[in-house]
Regions:
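A short, N-terminal "cap"/entry segment at the start of jelly-roll beta-barrel domains
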Residues: 1-36
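Short, surface-exposed secondary-structure edge patches
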Residues: 41, 60, 76-78
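Short acidic-glycine-tyrosine-enriched beta hairpin
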Residues: 74-91
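Asparagine-centered strand-capping/turn motif at beta-strand->loop junctions
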Residues: 97-99
């Protein structure tokens, strides 16, 4: 068993080629083989957003605070309020932003 203590892993600014606006990424856990799942807490300042992107294995996102918005390629912009879970299929092109 491995325990990651709160605050023990360094935060970093979201990279400019992935995000527009102020975004902070706090790692929670990395995948340990054979697992492939990792997790992070990503904080968007109001108006910040991701670039259009995909995830080869899909992605699950839990909205924990403030209202977010998401759009998949060819789809409508959808609201994702706190408590909602957004799941994407592998390679589904999308973006997300916060208000």
């Amino acid at each position: 068993m491995e325990i990651k203590r709160c605050g023990s892993q360094p935060s970093h600014k979201g990279p400019a080629d992935w995000f527009t606006g102020r975004v902070r990424v706090d790692p929670l856990f990395q995948a340990n083989a054979p697992a492939r799942a990792s997790g992070a807490s990503v904080t968007f300042e109001p108006g910040a957003r991701t670039a259009w992107h995909t995830h080869p294995l899909g992605q699950s996102l839990i909205v924990t605070a403030v209202c977010g918005w998401a759009q998949r390629d060819g789809g409508p912009i959808e609201e994702i309020p706190p408590g909602d879970v957004s799941q994407l299929a592998p390679n589904e092109k999308h973006w997300r932003r916060a208000d």
